[in-house]
UniProtKB/Swiss-Prot annotation:
Cellular component aspect of the GO annotation: cytosol
Organism: Caldicellulosiruptor saccharolyticus (strain ATCC 43494 / DSM 8903 / Tp8T 6331)
Gene name linked to the record: acpS
The enzyme's E.C. designation: 2.7.8.7
Species classification: Bacteria, Bacillati, Bacillota, Bacillota incertae sedis, Caldicellulosiruptorales
Main location: cytoplasm
Domain of life: Bacteria
Binding-site list for Mg(2+): D8, E55
MF GO annotations: holo-[acyl-carrier-protein] synthase activity; magnesium ion binding
Claim: Chaperone is one of the keywords in the record: no
Keyword ATP-binding: no
Cofactor: Mg(2+)
Protein name as annotated: Holo-[acyl-carrier-protein] synthase
Length: 123
């Protein structure tokens, strides 16, 4: 059963203009995410897509952002599809709300990245 849906869209240009870019990356992304971003040569579409995904997941949990960005980790499954792994406060919130799965989709094109997250719980 669908608990909630979160959607986020970001302009890629916003990430090109970030001052202290390295600090931003370390503050927002987990070590595994940074490794993936590095493997993509710090592609701005990838960075924007992952950021939008984290925002969409937070919205799907309908709590506002009451946890750190690193509490949400975007991973890839064996087919290259995005999946979500939660830690710390975000994981606790899901357990309290009885959310069993978060389905995630990320898309981007030239100037924007968008993500949609669907939080599911058992009926």
């Amino acid at each position: 059963m669908i608990f909630n849906i979160g959607i986020d869209i970001v302009e890629v240009e916003r990430f090109k203009n970030i001052k202290r870019f390295d600090s931003f990356l370390k503050r927002v992304f987990t070590q595994k995410e940074l490794e993936y971003i590095r493997s993509k040569n710090f592609n701005m579409l990838t960075i924007a897509g992952y950021f939008a995904a984290k925002e969409a997941v937070a919205k799907a949990l309908s709590t506002g952002i009451v946890f750190g960005f690193k509490d949400i980790e975007i991973q890839k499954d064996t087919n290259g599809c995005p999946k979500v792994k939660l830690y710390n406060r975000a994981k606790e919130i899901c357990e309290n709300l009885k959310i069993t799965n978060i389905v995630l989709s990320i898309s981007h094109q030239n100037s924007v990245a968008v993500a949609c997250a669907i939080a599911e719980k058992e009926e």
